Structures are given as C-alpha cells and as structure tokens.
Amino acid sequence: MNNLKIMGNPLPDMPWEERPAASREIMWRCSANPIIPRDLLATSNSIFNSAVVPFKKGKYNYAGVFRCDDTNIRMRLHVGFSADGLKWDILEEDIRLEGADPEVGTWVYGYDPRVVKIEDKYYVTWCNGYHGDPTIGVAWTDDFQTFHQLENAFLPYNRNGVLFP
C-alpha cells in the first residue's frame, strides 16, 4: 500500500486530504462533503461531480461536467469551472450538443459523465438515454463551451463507459 504511484502530470494545486488515521481504505471521502451543495443551481434537486479535469481558463484551473437533476428529477449535464477544485461555478444552462445526426442527438436523459483529455481534446462519456434505453454517449470539446456529439458507443444497453488515454 505504501508503493502508490500516480501516473500523469503533477497537479500541485489539486485539493487533497490525507487518509484518516486508522483507515485502511484505498479511497476515502473528503471530510468537508458535500463539496457541491445539491441545490447550487436555481433548479437543481441534486448535483453529482464525477468528471473533473485540470483546465486553465482565466481565473479557473479546473473544468467539469456535472449531472444536475432538476426538481422534476430530469437528468441533465452541465459545465462547471473552479479555481481551487472545491468552490464551483456551475452554469445554469445544460450542455447543448452539436453536430450529431438528429436521430442520435435527440436528448432523453444523461448521467454519470466522465471526462478524459486525449491529445488536444477533452472527451466526455456519459450514460445517454437513446430511444428510452441506456447507451454510452460520446462528445468532445476543446473549450468546455462547444461540445461535439459523436455516435453512441456500444449499442444497445450499456452505461458508465470511460475512455482511457
């Protein structure tokens, strides 16, 4: 357990909390949870933060794609930015996906987003409602403003896909 090695670029300003004393867990939660309040947005019932990456934009050092359920529990994806990885500015509007064939791009629901940087693009995967069934949606962005939707991956009936660089 003492031989952990993190592969990737250093992130010296990433928030970190040491493992609690006497804990043997591989992963542990921040003692300040929840980091993002469930009702941060005017219409949100709950917000889930599973897709954050380092991203420099003005005062911000991090960008993320968040599942934000509204008060009718409609699952939507929203973009957020943070200077410190703890205090987040999440945009009120949900992500608008561009470029997909209308049959693929019709929004039903989306949840459990993941983001990975591959070369000069950030790829987002999420559980995408496609004709009422779950599949893996895929889109890319280079600025966290415009998202280009690609074909759904692994039809039918898949969810929680992730790309590894």
Task: Give the role of each language-model region.
Residues 1-108, 116-165:
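Beta-rich carbohydrate-recognition and catalytic domains
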